[in-house]
Amino acid sequence: MTAKVILNPYSGRWLAQKRRPEMEAALRAAGMEYEIIETGGPGEGVTLTEAAARQGFSPIIAAGGDGAIGEVINGLHRASPDGVLGPLGLMPFGTANDLVHNLGLPLDLGEMARAIASGKTRRIDLGTANEWVFDNNSAVGLEPMVTLYNIRMVRLR
């Protein structure tokens, strides 16, 4: 099957965009067929992922930080009426990469590409708050306020 990479080019303050060629080389070296689509702004990863999942792409690869991963998971959730999400691959380009660290996954793109290509999966628990599915954490107070402020910031190159 062909994988769909949902790339947030802004992740890690444009780190994802800069490392895109490295990611593509890693996916090719792992023998993967893939298509890449870039998100254009906050929330777009949800709709792009939902469409990709409904079109039969598998796995879906979230290329970005924790926010991008969250959007991809929500897109997979919307595409799955039975609540069972399809396989998800991760390409860590974020500032913190909390989920990747908490799962003990490698930050090396080559290692991640080989892991995705192997097809090995594991289940993780998800939570829901106000119809938003979360994979790693949910917060109140300062953290979401900082996130909202960050979303409104101009994305300078």
Give, region by region, the residue ranges found by the protein language model.
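Short, active-site-adjacent cap segments at secondary-structure transitions
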Residues: 68-70, 98
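Catalytic core of DAGKc-family lipid kinases
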Residues: 30, 39, 77-157
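ATP/NTP phosphate-donor binding region
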Residues: 1-62, 70, 74
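Glycine-rich beta-strand-to-loop/alpha-helix junction loops that act as flexible
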Residues: 9, 63-65, 91-93
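Positions that flank functional sites
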Residues: 42, 67, 115
